[in-house]
Amino acid sequence: MNTAAIDQTDARPLDTTTAPMVDPFGRAVTYLRVSVTDRCDFRCTYCMAEHMAFLPKKDLLTLEELQRLCSAFIAKGVRKLRLTGGEPLVRKNIMFLIRELGKEIEAGRLDELTLTTNGSQLSKFAAELVDCGVRRINVSLDTLDPDKFRQITRWGELARVLEGIDAALAAGLKVKINAVALKDFNDAEIPELMRWAHGRGMDLTLIETMPMGEVDEDRTDHYLPLSEMRRRLEADFTLSDIPYRTGGPARYVEVAETGGRLGLITPLTHNFCESCNRVRLTCTGTLYMCLGQNDAADLRAALRATDDDAYLAQVIDEAIGRKPKGHDFIIDREHNRPAVARHMSVTGG
């Protein structure tokens, strides 16, 4: 990890009116993804090993520290903030952080606060999320088959997730379904999943499996290029490319037969690096400038070194200056190893 020292005597005060941070390749960094915990109540086979060793709780940033870091990024031009995990809603007292960050929207300093969830806790928190200023969420859901759902999550209950989605829609949240396309597992039911999502007014986004972290299965067995999935869908559906964007990497098509939108996230077959506008913060204060690279900055040390947010801003600037041009994702069929050693649950999915 690169933790180059920075002279605190050169610290400059934060300027909330400054332009967004710009990386060495001219990309404005306006989107922060924050993993508030590495813990999850599921153990999805492509995301985690079944017997994960979670981070000691003493290593995690407090919610107040996470709030301070998020505020520092907002002051430096971040306009969109997404909370992830693990499963963000299993973090104790997480609504404190969400409510505090919602105040940034009220003050006009943040355009959007959202989160990615597995849906298991939505029945409990959906209405409160809306009250805190959250307007849309992503729900990870790879199958509508209860047995397959239990198989891929290892112990999840599909009915609980579907109840959570119903609660979110009833509360007024805009819901997008994220599904990892897996060969010989859920590829045959993606048309059904798409019809179901579109019939309820939800977008569906398909994602190629990403080679991150050691898991208990061989990813190459289930890797499915979305170019192939699109060709299959076009046998039964009319897909038209549209310019719709949500600030993320998905490219969207409109499905004439359902009237809904289908997103495609293709980190391996068609990467999105040239327009990358985001960085990722872990629950331990590590900042990853790229999902598919290992270079990182230790913001926890800067956070705890001083109460001076100007020093923290300098450390952030130095990190953004190291944001790479692109990731190194590749499916390594020869050696059966991930391109990046850390799990997605640590980085933030």
From Swiss-Prot:
Keyword set, alphabetical order: 4Fe-4S, GTP-binding, Iron, Iron-sulfur, Lyase, Metal-binding, Molybdenum cofactor biosynthesis, Nucleotide-binding, S-adenosyl-L-methionine
Family matches, as Gene3D superfamilies: Aldolase class I (3.20.20.70)
Binding site for S-adenosyl-L-methionine: 46, 86, 140, 210
Binding site for [4Fe-4S] cluster 1: 40, 44, 47
Cofactor(s) needed by this chain: [4Fe-4S] cluster
Comment on bound cofactor: Binds 2 [4Fe-4S] clusters. Binds 1 [4Fe-4S] cluster coordinated with 3 cysteines and an exchangeable S-adenosyl-L-methionine and 1 [4Fe-4S] cluster coordinated with 3 cysteines and the GTP-derived substrate.
Binding site for [4Fe-4S] cluster 2: 273, 276, 290
Protein name per UniProt: GTP 3',8-cyclase
Domain Radical SAM core stretches: 24-250
Pfam family name, one: Fer4_12
Lineage: Bacteria, Pseudomonadati, Pseudomonadota, Alphaproteobacteria, Hyphomicrobiales
Role noted for this protein: Catalyzes the cyclization of GTP to (8S)-3',8-cyclo-7,8-dihydroguanosine 5'-triphosphate.
Enzyme class, spelled out: lyase
One Gene Ontology molecular-function label: metal ion binding
Assembly information from the UniProt record: Monomer and homodimer.
Enzymatic reactions: GTP + AH2 + S-adenosyl-L-methionine = (8S)-3',8-cyclo-7,8-dihydroguanosine 5'-triphosphate + 5'-deoxyadenosine + L-methionine + A + H(+)
GO biological process, one term: Mo-molybdopterin cofactor biosynthetic process
PANTHER family linked: MOLYBDENUM COFACTOR BIOSYNTHESIS PROTEIN 1, MOLYBDOPTERIN COFACTOR SYNTHESIS PROTEIN A
Family membership noted in the UniProt record: Belongs to the radical SAM superfamily. MoaA family.
E.C. numbers: 4.1.99.22
Binding site for GTP: 33, 82, 116, 176, 278-280
Pathway in which the depicted protein is active: Cofactor biosynthesis; molybdopterin biosynthesis
InterPro entries: Aldolase_TIM, Elp3/MiaA/NifB-like_rSAM, MoaA, MoaA_NifB_PqqE_Fe-S-bd_CS, MoaA_twitch, MoCo_biosynth_MoaA/MoaC, rSAM
